């Protein structure tokens, strides 16, 4: 069972074989690409405490961890993880690692283990777009 090279670069502790990668089609965003993407977000968006960000295929959290790090330049950690970041991840082991890396409980309603193509995206609270899906 060979460990996937990309997994070694992602900082994940989950053992991912080449067979698993082939079966699940998991692709992880390398840290340098995460940094580039996060640095492309306009500063006024990062500074706005009402900004929200979702990763609908979060994996083990590379993008959200990088984004959280950047947001901590402007906001406290509690506000970021409870008001600004959201994630959906289908693989239970990835979801668990995502939550550990973000420092939240695995049952936190912003970070769900579900199929992003079927999830209702309410995250437990009405968000005002439900009227468009009836």
Question: What do these predicted ranges mean?
Answer:
Residues 1-134:
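SAM-dependent methyltransferase catalytic region
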